């Protein structure tokens, strides 16, 4: 880390998306180490800085948020700022650029970034900083679906190990902590949720332990299935014979890849109990007997990784009932007029929505919609038609895709979430479920941001007989 800091000294450093969770924490790291010549960029206007910062730092109390924002303004004052219309001005003269994982998504807005990238200016991500420089034992959790939940479960279990546990993910409720990287020792544990975009700017060291939840053809609007697989599996392929890969045996893609890995492979399986290591096979039985446990795969993955620490007390099922799960993932928000409302808006793929429906059963009205990311939805449509009371779609790419396969009388389309929830409530029977699970991307941006939250809509519902 010292060499990296010296490398940065006297360089023209540019930080993109500085009001975000990644950008603001990178700036904190730079200022903490007394690095000068920093230029900060954000597409928001200067009078929107506070609003944007607080939007991207959700998972803390209001008091903590105010304190963090005050510190951020102090850091920002020590940089040259390029906001609003000045966004990315001078980026082509940078010596090094720190970018958030999302920068490639906004091609039109970030054209100057692409020019700088193609020019050969080094781009660095916060994930690469963790992987390359953290002294802690790193557990990287990746996969198409369930990586955030698995990482969060793992954090809660390992906090009982007596070792200091650091955890950060892709969500706005988790704080980044690259500014604390120099505090981490080899006796500490750093748990990272890692998406494919976080690997695109490279890394020079793979985690000692990688947990791979599953692999599905996702993000096909950005890259091909083969390229997605190549990037997604780069973590486990870069591991050495001294590392461990915790692999979902139920994924044929991962199963085929696992036989060619240099690392030591541990399988976990919700379908084949005998494929789990002996020390956690009884956990499989426990989970199958608990009908309320809707994330069996994630719990098995976390316990399989935990087994590598060879501490029997950490493998107790006593932890399971007290586990906290991430918000907006099969979260029971409310029961009204004997109808259960579930918030699952973090489900941005058809596979995670289908899994939610398997857990809830066919007495469920599904509300979904969003950007399809180039995914083939035929299997999803067949499954949901057979396993739901009714499908309600919000007008989007997904509703267009569904319309290609089924006539309009098979489903209903609404322009706004409030209308969809009102309709779902009206047609639901006693002890039935309403599941808001997008199965596609940008649901929050398109249907919730700047509008009423799901909870607020539910609260405003009149008695069902009056609708």
Language-model segments: residues:
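Glycine-rich, highly charged phosphate/nucleotide-binding loops
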Residues: 63-89
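A short helix->loop->beta-strand "cap" motif at the edges of active sites that frequently abuts
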Residues: 34-36, 118-121, 239-244, 261-264, ...
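ATP-dependent carboxylate-amine ligase
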Residues: 1-66, 79, 93, 164, ...
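Adenine nucleotide phosphate-binding catalytic loops in nucleotide-utilizing enzymes
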Residues: 222-229, 233, 259-351, 450, ...
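Walker A (P-loop) phosphate-binding motif
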Residues: 126-172
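Charged, amphipathic alpha-helical linker segments immediately N-terminal to NTP-binding catalytic cores
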Residues: 85-116
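Flexible active-site lid/hinge loop adjacent to a nucleotide/diphosphate
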Residues: 184-261, 266-267, 272-290, 445-448
């Amino acid at each position: 880390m010292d060499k990296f800091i010296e490398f940065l000294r006297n360089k023209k450093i540019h930080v993109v998306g500085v009001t975000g969770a990644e950008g603001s924490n990178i700036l904190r790291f730079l200022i903490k180490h007394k690095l000068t010549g920093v230029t900060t960029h954000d597409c928001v206007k200067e009078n929107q800085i506070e609003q944007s910062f607080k939007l991207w730092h959700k998972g803390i109390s209001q008091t903590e948020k105010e304190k963090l924002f005050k510190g951020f303004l102090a850091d920002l004052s020590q940089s040259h700022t390029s906001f609003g219309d000045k966004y990315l001005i001078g980026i082509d003269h940078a010596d090094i650029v720190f970018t958030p994982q999302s920068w490639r998504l906004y091609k039109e807005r970030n054209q100057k970034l692409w020019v700088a990238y193609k020019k050969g200016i080094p781009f660095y991500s916060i994930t690469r900083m963790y992987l390359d420089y953290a002294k802690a034992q790193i557990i990287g959790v990746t996969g198409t679906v369930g990586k955030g939940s698995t990482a969060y479960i793992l954090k809660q279990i390992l906090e009982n190990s007596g070792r200091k546990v650091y955890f950060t993910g892709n969500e706005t409720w988790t704080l980044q902590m690259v500014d604390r990287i120099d505090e981490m020792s080899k006796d500490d544990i750093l748990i990272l949720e890692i998406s494919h975009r976080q690997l695109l700017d490279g890394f020079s060291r793979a985690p000692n332990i990688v947990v791979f939840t599953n692999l599905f053809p996702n993000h096909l609007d950005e890259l091909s299935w083969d390229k997605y697989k190549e990037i997604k599996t780069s973590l486990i392929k870069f591991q050495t014979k001294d590392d461990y890969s915790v692999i979902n045996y139920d994924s044929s893609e991962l199963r085929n890849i696992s036989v060619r890995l240099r690392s030591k492979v541990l399988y976990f399986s919700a379908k084949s109990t005998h494929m789990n290591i002996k020390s956690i096979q009884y956990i499989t039985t426990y989970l199958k007997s608990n009908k309320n446990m809707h994330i069996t795969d994630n719990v098995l993955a976390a316990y399989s990784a935990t087994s590598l620490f060879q501490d029997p007390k950490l493998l107790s099922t006593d932890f399971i009932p007290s586990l906290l799960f991430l918000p907006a993932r099969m979260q029971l928000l409310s029961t009204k007029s004997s109808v259960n409302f579930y918030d699952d808006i973090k489900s941005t793929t058809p596979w995670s929505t289908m899994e939610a429906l398997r857990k809830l059963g066919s007495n469920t009205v599904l509300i979904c919609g969003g950007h399809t990311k180039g995914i083939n939805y035929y299997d999803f449509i067949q499954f949901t038609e057979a396993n739901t009371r009714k499908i309600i779609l919000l007008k989007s790419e997904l509703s267009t895709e569904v319309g290609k396969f089924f006539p309009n009388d098979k489903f209903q389309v609404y322009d706004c979430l409030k209308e969809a929830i009102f309709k779902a409530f009206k047609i639901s029977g006693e002890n039935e479920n309403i599941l808001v699970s997008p199965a596609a991307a940008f649901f929050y941006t398109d249907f919730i941001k700047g509008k009423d939250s799901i909870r607020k809509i539910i609260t405003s519902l009149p008695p069902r007989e009056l609708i």
